[in-house]
C-alpha cells in the first residue's frame, strides 16, 4: 500500500491531532480486526490501518511522511504479524487489568483480569517428586517411605505471620488489593496495567510485628515423610497424586498436592513392554529336536514350559497371565519367551559320528572341511 494516503486510510485530516489519530485508529482496528470481521478484504484493510497508524502516531515518522511521502518511511511501516490477532501482534493481555479501551470493548469482561483477594484463603502449591524403584517392586507393588522438604503452616502464629496478640493491617498503598494500577501510553491509547504492590508484595496486608518463628511468612520449611503404597503394575514415567501433601496454603487455605513420578530400574532378566514381559531362554539342539519340558523364570516365579519336538530357532512361546498386573485389576499381561537354540562348539568323535549318521539317514551329505596349513604340517610331522 505504498501509494495509499495514510491520512485517508485513517479518515483524518492532515492536521489531525494525536488524539484524533488514536481515536480513529481504535475505531478502525475494531472494525477490521480479523478475529471479528471475516469479510473478504478485512484482514488487508486491518494491515493498512496498522501501517498508517504506525507512521502517523510517531512524530518523527509523521514529519518524514509529510515531507517525502511513503518513500520517507520506506521499510518502517507494517505491524509485524498484525493479521494474527492481538496475541500475534505481540501483546500479552495476561498482565492487564481494566483496559478501558479497545481490548475491553472488543472482548468484554473476558479481557479483564480477575482480581483475587489476597487476604482470602489460598490453596498451597503442588510439589513434584521423582521416585526410583526396582523393577520387581513395580511388578509386585510395595510400601515405602518418601521424605522431602515443604513449607508447612507455622504453628507459632497459625499462618498469619504475626506475633501473638497482634494482627496484620490493610496495606494503605493498594488498599488491600495487593496490586497497583499503572496507566501507560501505547499505540492503542492509554492502557491500564496492574502490577504487584511493592509495599505489601501482593499480600494486601502489612505485618508490623512479624512472628519470630517464621519471620512473617506464615510458613516454615520442614521435612515431611509419608508412606507411599506403590501399586502393583506401575509403569515407568507414570505419575500419581497424593492429596494434601504439597505446600501449605495461605491465610488458612488448604495444602497443595504431591505428584510422584515413578522411574523404574531395568532388569537383567526381563524386558517390559506395557503389560507384557519378554524373555529369552537357551535350549540345546537335542531339546529342540526331541522336545522337552523346561523351567523358565517369570516375574511371578518359576513356570514350566513345554518345548515340542522340532522347535525352530527364535520360536516364541506365550505364557498366559505371567505378565504385569493391570493397575485397575482385571488380571495380568502375558510373558513372551523366545527360545535360542545353542549349537555346541566342541563335540567328541562319537557325537560327531552319530551326527554324521543322522544326516546320512536323512538323505543328506556333509562335505568335510579342508584342513588348514598348520593342521597339514602337523599331520606330516607326525607321519599321518
Curated annotation (Swiss-Prot):
CXXCXGXG motif repeats: 154-161, 171-178, 197-204, 211-218
Subunit and interaction comment: Homodimer.
Needed co-factor(s): Zn(2+)
Domain J: 5-69
Positions bound to Zn(2+) 2: 171, 174, 197, 200
UniProt-listed HAMAP family: DnaJ
Domain of life: Bacteria
Name of the protein: Chaperone protein DnaJ
Cofactor note (record): Binds 2 Zn(2+) ions per monomer.
Any one of the GO BP annotations: protein refolding
UniProt subcellular location: Cytoplasm
Species, as recorded: Lactobacillus acidophilus (strain ATCC 700396 / NCK56 / N2 / NCFM)
Keyword Cytoplasm listed: yes
Higher taxonomy: Bacteria, Bacillati, Bacillota, Bacilli, Lactobacillales
Amino acid at each position: 500500500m505504498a501509494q495509499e494516503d495514510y491520512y485517508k486510510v485513517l479518515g483524518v485530516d492532515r492536521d489531525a491531532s494525536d488524539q484524533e489519530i488514536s481515536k480513529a485508529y481504535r475505531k478502525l482496528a475494531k472494525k477490521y480486526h480479523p478475529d471479528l470481521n471475516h469479510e473478504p478484504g478485512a484482514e488487508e484493510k486491518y494491515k493498512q490501518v496498522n501501517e498508517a497508524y504506525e507512521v502517523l502516531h510517531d512524530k518523527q515518522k509523521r514529519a518524514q511522511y509529510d515531507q517525502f511521502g511513503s518513500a520517507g518511511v520506506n521499510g518502517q511501516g507494517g505491524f509485524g504479524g498484525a493479521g494474527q490477532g492481538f496475541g500475534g501482534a505481540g501483546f500479552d493481555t495476561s498482565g492487564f487489568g481494566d483496559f478501558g479501551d479497545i481490548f475491553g470493548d472488543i472482548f468484554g469482561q473476558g479481557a479483564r483480569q480477575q482480581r483475587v483477594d489476597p487476604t482470602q484463603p489460598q490453596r498451597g502449591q503442588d510439589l513434584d517428586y521423582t521416585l526410583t524403584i526396582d523393577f520387581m517392586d513395580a511388578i509386585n507393588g510395595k510400601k515405602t517411605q518418601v521424605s522431602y522438604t515443604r513449607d508447612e503452616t507455622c504453628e507459632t502464629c497459625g499462618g498469619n505471620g504475626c506475633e501473638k496478640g497482634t494482627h496484620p493491617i490493610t496495606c494503605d498503598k493498594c488498599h488491600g488489593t495487593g496490586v497497583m494500577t499503572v496507566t501507560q501510553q501505547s499505540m492503542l491509547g492509554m492502557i491500564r496495567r496492574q502490577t504487584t504492590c511493592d509495599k505489601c508484595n501482593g499480600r494486601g496486608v502489612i505485618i508490623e510485628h512479624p512472628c519470630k518463628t517464621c519471620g512473617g511468612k506464615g510458613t516454615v520449611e520442614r521435612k515431611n515423610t509419608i508412606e507411599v503404597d506403590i501399586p502393583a503394575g506401575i509403569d515407568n514415567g507414570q505419575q500419581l497424586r497424593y492429596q494434601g501433601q504439597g505446600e501449605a496454603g495461605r491465610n488458612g487455605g488448604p495444602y497443595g498436592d504431591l505428584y510422584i513420578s515413578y522411574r523404574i530400574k531395568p532388569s537383567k532378566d526381563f524386558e517390559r513392554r506395557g503389560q507384557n514381559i519378554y524373555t529369552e531362554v537357551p535350549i540345546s539342539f537335542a531339546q529342540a529336536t526331541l522336545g522337552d519340558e523346561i523351567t523358565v523364570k517369570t516375574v511371578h516365579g518359576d513356570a514350566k514350559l513345554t518345548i515340542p519336538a522340532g522347535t525352530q530357532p527364535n520360536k516364541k512361546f506365550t505364557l498366559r497371565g505371567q505378565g504385569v498386573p493391570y493397575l485397575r485389576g482385571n488380571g495380568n499381561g502375558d510373558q513372551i519367551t523366545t527360545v535360542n537354540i545353542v549349537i555346541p562348539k566342541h563335540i567328541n568323535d562319537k557325537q560327531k559320528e552319530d551326527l554324521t549318521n543322522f544326516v546320512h539317514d536323512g538323505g543328506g551329505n556333509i562335505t568335510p572341511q579342508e584342513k588348514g596349513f598348520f593342521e597339514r604340517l602337523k599331520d606330516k610331522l607326525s607321519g599321518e
